[in-house]
Amino acid sequence: MIYPEHYDVIVVGGGHAGTEAALAPARMGLKTLLLTHNVDTLGQMSCNPAIGGIGKGHLVKEIDAMGGLMAIATDHAGIQFRTLNSSKGPAVRATRAQADRVLYRQSVRTALENQQNLAIFQQEVVDILVENHRASGVVTKMGLTFKAKTVILTAGTFLAGKIHIGLDNYAGGRAGDPAATRLAERLRDLNLRVDRLKTGTPPRLDARTINFEVLAKQPGDEVLPVMSFMGEVGQHPRQIPCYITHTNHQTHDIIRANLDRSPMYTGIIEGIGPRYCPSIEDKVMRFGDRNGHQIYLEPEGLTTIEVYPNGISTSLPFDVQMAIVNSMKGLENTRIIKAGYAIEYDYFDPRDLKPTLETKAIEGLFFAGQINGTTGYEEAAAQGLLAGINAALQVQAKPSWFPTRDVAYTGVLVDDLCTLGTKEPYRVFTSRAEYRLLLREDNADIRLTPIAHQLGLIDEARWQRFNQKMENIERERERLKQIWIHPQSAYVDAVNQLVNSPLTREVNGEDLLRRPEINYAKLTEIAAFAPALDDRQAAEQVEIAIKYQGYIEHQYNEIERHKRHENTLIPAEFDYNKVDSLSNEVRAKLMQHRPISIGQASRISGITPAAISILLVNLKKQGMLKRGEI
């Protein structure tokens, strides 16, 4: 049977990629259908109960700046908020929140059900319809056909998913859910490169059997941050702490003694796991000289006894998992509620995608999330948003849109995937971005909200809030420029108490704020510069824009310089071994290929823009910068 209604966009999968992929075209006014095998797991946090972190928090802010859901859901579900790297520069500061799984899922489902132009249907998809090299719809398990102009596939770990616990394994998309076996078989028939990846999750613990009194407590921030630019602290539920324990020599001995029962170390698992979220088996074998590894005990919610032990992802047999848990301080008598496991699944080479996340082989078919080789809720959601936007633009016969590396971390993510591909689960870090001072959490709305407004992604309330913030920033900067303090001023004593050396010349508010020892809060406590802005976000922007103005201008100049250096020649005698800042991998590839220009070097697989920056700096130091035509 063909379903009587036809759609502009069909989204397959209701995880973090799928929900953002469905909401975006619906907000843009397109008739959208979200298909999921189970409506009760929409927005499910399959692994750790947390959103954000280094690099990941930046993605969440970008999603939010474009009207996405993830940050808003986190503000309503977050039970512990922290600003990571708060003592460091603004480029690497990041917001992270522990989330109540139930509250998060409820928030996501409510948003989906209340979104105009969006329909939801529960049924497993087993086939993608392709006519004349163009996606035209999907077929469900019961033979129901849905027709659409575009299709977005966000299958997560479900494609030919296989769950491993010890030497036993079975088909599954995640614990308790079936694998998408028929859909995986159908996709393998398409002209796309496919491979296998692996990820894992730790056992879940019974909080009633943990001795928290002997463990270090990790509270959230006293001044609570918010995740969304539209968020309010009052939206947060009750806040609770996490706790910290450690593995020890006994733990490591247990693991080493049972590697012959590990599916990873016996060759049963073929897929490659995430480098930056390794299993406890990998940690012990790769870092055997360590006395212990820190394990964070993260509550899964306010109304559950489940605790997530972040740091002991494992696929070892259940009896070994019990021994590992009981070997750690505070967990000597702890019971396991759910076993940890590893899962293998199909992913498709992202080099077969356009930067819009549309497949090159099949027009109108988009991939987003773990199907593209990424790991993490945030990476998936960012891809879902981008795929949803471009599916909608295609239906509207409008030009596609995707951010470049100097505009958003989403641009870094997509450029890395589509240009370099990946052989292991890819995650975002601030270190992957060469212009990270421009890509801060705090200015994601300044970078992206005007674009979102042009695309029709945000409502009038968000647009008005954004414009008010921009006006506040401009007015406050102008106000600080107009307030002058000279050495004979009545306020000079108050100023001199804050600065390292007394004033000897007339300065204005911006001059003072540029000094490292003065921040906006201290400055506006001085009567001459009072009152401070009530708008916390605007106040933060004022301080960063003034204090880092020179560095920010330098990065903009660097972007222009990179564009100019496309045809810059690399001398044949250049010695890459003398460039200590390059990784061994990058150095080896450059020596092997011997590129004749910077542009050519930048297109070698595995040579990152950050490596090109290092190369340019060293060429300049050695007086070797030459321009030429290739």
UniProtKB/Swiss-Prot annotation:
Family as reported in the entry's similarity comment: Belongs to the MnmG family.
NCBIfam families: mnmG_gidA
Localization in the cell: Cytoplasm
Organism expressing this protein natively: Haemophilus ducreyi (strain 35000HP / ATCC 700724)
UniProt xrefs under PANTHER family: GLUCOSE INHIBITED DIVISION PROTEIN A, PROTEIN MTO1 HOMOLOG, MITOCHONDRIAL
Residues at which FAD binds: 13-18
Molecular-function annotations in GO: flavin adenine dinucleotide binding
Function recorded in the entry: NAD-binding protein involved in the addition of a carboxymethylaminomethyl (cmnm) group at the wobble position (U34) of certain tRNAs, forming tRNA-cmnm(5)s(2)U34.
Sorted UniProt keywords: Cytoplasm, FAD, Flavoprotein, NAD, tRNA processing
Cellular-component GO terms for this entry: cytosol
InterPro entries named among the record's database cross-references: FAD/NAD-bd_sf, GIDA_C_N, MnmG, MnmG-rel, MnmG-rel_CS, MnmG_C, MnmG_C_subdom, MnmG_C_subdom_sf
Cofactor(s) the protein needs: FAD
Subunit structure as annotated in this protein's UniProt entry: Homodimer. Heterotetramer of two MnmE and two MnmG subunits.
Highest taxon of source: Bacteria
Protein name in UniProt: tRNA uridine 5-carboxymethylaminomethyl modification enzyme MnmG
GO biological process: tRNA methylation; tRNA wobble uridine modification
Binding sites annotated in the UniProt record for NAD(+): 273-287
